[in-house]
Amino acid sequence: VVVIYASMIINADPKLDYSDVLIVPQKSNVKSRKEVCLEVSKTFNNGTSWSGVPIMAANMSTVGTHKMALVLSEYNIVTCLRKGGDYYSSFASANPDKEKYVSLTLGLDAESKLFVDSADIKDPTFICVDVANGYMTEFHNFTRKVREKWPKSILIAGNVVTPEGVEELSKVGVDLVKVGIGSGSMCLTRRVAGVGYPQLSAVLECAQTAEAFDIGIVADGGIIHPGDFAKYFVAGAAFVMAGGIFAGHDECGGEIRHGEHGELRMLHYGMSSKTANEKYNGGLSDYRASEGRTVEVPYRGSVRNTIQEIFGGIRSACSYVGAFDLPSLYTCGTLIKVNRTINNIFENHEI
């Protein structure tokens, strides 16, 4: 009886993260990485079309800035601006030619609700409705309201990590479901709440369900190396969102500090951290725990260097599997489970 009961509450199927797999090389007709095209063209269910590189900078205060959006738009990458209707509107009005590469970000806070009720703006190209727990009925109802207000926008909503979560959001009219709970470098939800899902399995399972409902997923969180972007695309992600890999750059707009040994560092924090709550919510409520980190990351100069590394890594992955573009990376790519992905014996000796 105990065994039967235990099987009801424990799913024993093995679940995988990105560190558990590698992409398998195969015959390739790609002669040079420069032959690989990273731009895609998509038409969504509401008839809206978009072309660009399906990578998104996360809507974190230290990443989703106007400066970041200006630079990433040059590479046709989307920046999900930090939360706030006015923050989006000021960018869109000043840079109408770059609006297609930014997203308005909303939450369940009073400011977001007021903006939806009162804003008189044309449909933004992208809208990201972002909460930590995408399973709440209140979140579903609010997302439906956003869809009704701006029917021509490409609507992103999340986060969830299961096929059931994807199905529920498909019912309220989203185009893209944001997938990932606890996988981000600044997230402590798995430690504090004990909740989460290994990110590779979440993306694989959610992408299959999304395809059945004719929508896509945004794989959000878990990026450590450029190669992880490629793994996301092989797993079926329509877009990949990242925060930590874009942190520490000039475009983040944060204060540059001197570390203990004189090295340059920048502040970076999760949006469920104590720092974020004190800055935007008047402090951490007495019924809540901080579920995000606050760290100082090494100062890395311009984000352009990081973009080159990301693009180069994805192109290299494509060349290894014979893919001339990202849709082909999904159809050609195969992932294999491994015990160890990287030889890091000299990792602390790089110059």
List where the protein language model places each region:
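Alpha/beta catalytic cores of nucleotide-metabolism and tRNA/nucleoside-modifying enzymes
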Residues: 3-31, 172, 194-219, 223-351
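Active-site entrance/lid segments in N-terminal catalytic domains of soluble metabolic enzymes
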Residues: 4-216, 244-249, 345
